[in-house]
Every structure is written in C-alpha cells, then in structure tokens.
C-alpha cells in the first residue's frame, strides 16, 4: 500500500514526548471485544467504546488485521491464537464490518474535545503480547514473494493477487525477527492506524487511506515515547487505534509490515 499522505502531514505532527502537562486522573482498560471495535471505519456517528477525561491514560489492546482462520492457513498453531480473537470474529456481524479491513479498537470519547481542538496522543508504552506476526506479500512485489516452485496457494491471509502470506516468529527477549534466512530485523512496535473521527459530513470513511483525521498513516516513527497531535473534527474526538506492527520499513513495500497484536498505554490530552 502506498498512501498519499500530503494532507495528513500538513495536519499531524510526530514529536518526542516531553514533560507531562496534564496529570492523569485515571487509568482505563480497553480490551478488544465485539463491543469495543470499529471494523474498517472512522465515523463521527460511531458509538463510543470508552469515555475518558483529558489527561487520562488508557491501557489498550489491538488485534492484527487477519482472522484466526487466515492465521491457521499460514501455519499458526490453534493454541497460539488467543480465544478472544476467535470470539471477536464470531461476535461482529458481517453487516457491521467495513468498508475497510482494519479492526480498530475504540472509539474513545474524550470529554472536552470538540471541532477546532487538537488531540495530543502520547504513546507511553507498546508491547508484544504474542510471539509471532505475519506478513502478507502482494501487489507489485508479488514476483518476489515466494521461493522458487512455491505457488503460494492455500496460504491465506491478505496476501492475495498471486502473493503469499506467512507467519513470522518473533524473539521478544532480543526484540528481533528473522524475516528471511540470515536476515534479522529489530522489532519496534507501533500502531499503523491512529486517528479520530472525520467531519460528520464525510460519513463513515474507509480505514485504508489516511486523511485529515490521520488514520492509517503506517508511520514507523510512532513508537513508545513519541506523541501524535491530531486535529479534532467532532465532539469527543472519537479516537481509534489498530493495525499493530512489530516492525516496518519506510512504508509497506510488500503491502504489509510484520502484522501482530499489540498492547500499550496511551495518554490523551485536549489542546
């Protein structure tokens, strides 16, 4: 995926987190369940999954953009797929999914935020709750996706169009992953999609392209210790996070990163 992010770059900034300017009043828990996800969209009309105050912190959980069935087709062991992932896919009806494919946790309604404000989102910590991710190689890179003689058939996941998807084990102690024989990359987890609801007149927007609401920027610099500033377009901001990546280069050259589940703590401040 190659995104036109000119608008996003003009309206969002990534900087190193500085000293706290608003002491957190409370730490909230936001797991990923059928009742706490926005499946494939950012939308001003979405029902909040959580309501917080400016300065509050949220311990949040997000799911990778692939199904338990897809992961098993790639070779993941059934016992390595958390039960809550199966419950999520069983619990969200098809008519509540889309138009995009990202399963985002939220929305988070921030009291006091309204159109014209700026929402400061601090990435305080980001961790890897499972020891694997996957890569779906496709698009114009498809001819490089497979080993010689490998058709890629039946390997499932998002790597369609003649590509291939595969499980990538991760060493969480060393924070590395071997992505190919002899090629090891450092793990620097981040959320590929962080955004707020767009203006109400935009309706329910696809989670795939980033825009004025931020969203699917796939910015590998948004690791723990950084801060994102996003313009607010609707009451409460309606913040969503997802599309967790364990590692990524400068863009998703083969269409994905090392996609995985993430847990982390964020802090939200209205400016």
PLM regions and their residue ranges:
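A generic structural signal for residues embedded in beta-strands
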Residues: 60, 118-121, 230
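Short, Lys/Arg- and Gly-enriched loop/turn segments at beta-strand edges
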Residues: 65-77, 126-137, 236-246
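Conserved mixed alpha/beta catalytic, RNA-binding, or beta-rich assembly cores of soluble enzyme
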Residues: 189-216, 220-271
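Bacterial N-terminal signal peptides
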Residues: 6-18
